Swiss-Prot record:
Protein name: CTP synthase
Function: Catalyzes the ATP-dependent amination of UTP to CTP with either L-glutamine or ammonia as the source of nitrogen. Regulates intracellular CTP levels through interactions with the four ribonucleotide triphosphates.
SUPFAM superfamilies: Class I glutamine amidotransferase-like (SSF52317), P-loop containing nucleoside triphosphate hydrolases (SSF52540)
Note: CTPSs have evolved a hybrid strategy for distinguishing between UTP and CTP. The overlapping regions of the product feedback inhibitory and substrate sites recognize a common feature in both compounds, the triphosphate moiety. To differentiate isosteric substrate and product pyrimidine rings, an additional pocket far from the expected kinase/ligase catalytic site, specifically recognizes the cytosine and ribose portions of the product inhibitor.
GO terms under cellular component: cytosol
Binding-site residues, UTP: S13, K188, T189, K190, P191, T192, Q193, K224
Residues that bind L-glutamine: Y54, G354, L382, G383, M384, Q385, E405, R462
Record-annotated active site: C381, H507, E509
Keywords on record: ATP-binding, Glutamine amidotransferase, Ligase, Magnesium, Metal-binding, Nucleotide-binding, Pyrimidine biosynthesis
CDD domains for this protein: CTPS_N, GATase1_CTP_Synthase
List of residues binding Mg(2+): D71, E141
Regulation: Allosterically activated by GTP, when glutamine is the substrate; GTP has no effect on the reaction when ammonia is the substrate. The allosteric effector GTP functions by stabilizing the protein conformation that binds the tetrahedral intermediate(s) formed during glutamine hydrolysis. Inhibited by the product CTP, via allosteric rather than competitive inhibition.
Gene3D superfamilies from the UniProt entry: 3.40.50.880, P-loop containing nucleotide triphosphate hydrolases
Length: 535
């Protein structure tokens, strides 16, 4: 029988529920259990695909093309599994499904209500994940904060599910904040007490409380939380701020979180093997070398917009025993000031994905600097498209070269809309999304990195390399090192006369893992080390 673990949050948002859920998943997997995981987001958007990165952060893309919450990236990286569209459910998706059923007549003329129709749909989404892979444990994170009106249907659904599947098969974990009063240095438990009171008023009694704090909890504080929240003392898990997120599973293991979960759910499993994870943390905390990578983007004031990119760089750093210092560079500043001011002392330059023309000229200047000064360069999605534009302008002499996204009537659209996108009017969920094969050319840097001829990578784009310019640009030194298997779509480009200049139409950052860095990020950091005199 599959067991169900629900992770809720209280007091404030952004407490780290996602990291807590991912860390627990890692601990349970290390014991030999099969783990599935999902997140419920209470917003009414169907998915985050059309949301501003400033509002939501990164959009994480799964193999099957779902545009999802960035926490799914944490889940995949920590647990080392590939998730699906069923792993991220929003209020918008739930209501869309229920209204579609009502329009089809599935409810036989009945009045459609939050209870039971919305809550039943939510429960069905939870059980669907259990049926999909038949795991030992399903971990479900409930987004938002207890007390938010948007979260109420989800909380009611997980309350009901305990009766549906049996109380011995469900466990509730509540992540909360124990703040410190700076004036006195005193830890305060009242916010936690009120948060649990709110949760209990809905009918949910937490089995475990994960208490986030800046400093360790004293025995008195732990006992006070246990008393007022009516849980066992050993079920109060302190989660003191860690120096990096990869330490969190080890910290929670020290607190005995997985032992309590195993005991309360009656799971049969072995002892955890965290040796590989311990090695990852050790290499992360004690690097031998150091590089500085500039990420040139338009959303750099919110680094979460490029979360998977930053983590993929760190994974490559772990592999090379190298501290990767990330310098966030606003591409608009490169349009106003000399690029040398921002780029002259970098070991590598990366231009990530994005949409719209704001800051694009700054990205093109950064790419020109990397090309002319032989600085290692990695371009992702828009970072490939702008690399093609830069090459067309400054090497091929097509001064008006551009993308039809930015200049629809330009004379040289070296980047153009995919043919199948030209009749698309609706923005949401209509891009080229998900996992696609790519055929690599032997003898190229891309082929050397992967060591394979056919690879599979995740995409999220509408625009592509315009094949009308393929012969001209390749004749001047642009190398097309990866294409779709039929050769029609250009997926990877390189420069033949550069130490390491590679750009991809896909998003390799989504497939990187701390124990298995993505080949392109691994080689990019390796090339950046060679430009660093400390190596």
């Amino acid at each position: 029988m599959t067991k169900f673990i629900f992770v809720t949050g209280g007091v404030v948002s952004s407490l780290g529920k996602g990291i807590t859920a991912a860390s627990l998943g890692r601990l349970l997997k290390s014991r030999g259990l099969k783990v599935a995981i999902q997140k419920f987001d209470p917003y009414i958007n169907v998915d985050p695909g059309t949301m501003s990165p400033y509002q939501h952060g990164e959009v994480f893309v799964t193999d099957d093309g779902a545009e999802t919450d960035l926490d799914l990236g944490h889940y995949e990286r920590f647990i080392d599994i590939n998730l699906t569209k069923n792993s991220n459910v929003t209020t918008g998706k739930v209501y869309w499904a229920v209204i579609s059923k009502e329009r089809r007549g599935d409810y036989l003329g009945g009045t459609v209500q939050v209870i039971p129709h919305i809550t039943n749909e939510i429960k069905e989404r939870i059980l669907r994940v259990a049926k999909e892979s038949n795991p030992d444990v399903v971990i479900t994170e409930i987004g938002g904060t207890v007390g938010d009106i948007e979260s109420l249907p989800f909380l009611e659904a997980i309350r009901q599910l305990k009766n549906d599947v049996g109380k011995d098969n469900v466990l509730y974990i509540h992540v909360t904040l124990v703040p410190t009063l700076r004036v006195t240095g005193e830890l305060k438990t009242k916010p936690t007490q009120h948060s649990v009171k709110e949760l209990r008023s809905i009918g949910i009694q937490p089995d475990i409380i994960v208490a986030r704090s800046e400093q360790p909890l004293s025995r008195e504080i732990t006992e006070k939380i246990a008393l007022f929240c009516d849980i066992d003392k050993n079920a109060v898990i302190q989660a003191v701020d860690a120096s990096n997120i990869y330490e969190v599973p080890l910290k929670l293991k020290e607190e005995g979180l997985d032992d309590i979960v195993i005991k309360k759910l009656g799971l049969t499993c072995g002892e955890p093997d965290l040796s590989e994870w311990e090695q990852i943390v050790e290499r992360y905390k004690n690097p031998k070398f150091e590089v500085t990578i500039g990420i040139v983007g338009k959303y750099v004031s919110l680094p979460d917009a490029y979360l998977s990119v930053a983590e993929a760089l760190r994974h490559a750093g772990i592999y090379h025993e190298t501290r990767v210092n990330i310098r966030w560079i606003d591409s608009e500043m490169l349009e106003k000031e000399p690029v040398e001011k921002y780029l002259s002392n970098l070991d590598g330059i990366l231009v990530p994905g994005g949409f719209g023309d704001r800051g694009v000229e700054g990205k093109i200047k950064a790419i020109q600097y990397a090309r002319e000064n032989k600085v290692p360069y990695l371009g992702l999605c828009l970072g490939m498209q702008t690399a093609v534009i830069e090459f067309a302008r400054n090497v091929a002499g097509l001064k008006d070269a551009n993308s039809s996204e930015f200049k629809p009537d330009g004379p040289h659209s070296v980047i153009d809309l995919l043919p199948e996108q030209k009749e698309v009017e609706q923005l949401g969920g209509t891009m080229r999304l998900g996992l696609y094969p790519c055929k690599l050319v032997p003898g190229t840097k891309a082929h050397a990195a992967y060591g394979e001829e056919i690879i599979y990578e995740r995409h999220r784009h509408r625009y592509e390399f315009n094949n009308e310019y393929r012969e001209l640009l390749t004749g001047l030194g642009l190398v097309i090192s990866g294409t779709s298997p039929d050769g029609r779509l250009v997926e990877i480009i390189e420069l033949s006369d550069h130490p390491w200049f590679v750009a991809t139409q896909f998003h390799p950052e989504f497939k990187s893992r701390p124990n298995r860095p993505h080949p392109l990020f691994r080689e990019f950091i390796g090339a950046s080390l060679k430009t660093n005199k400390l190596f």
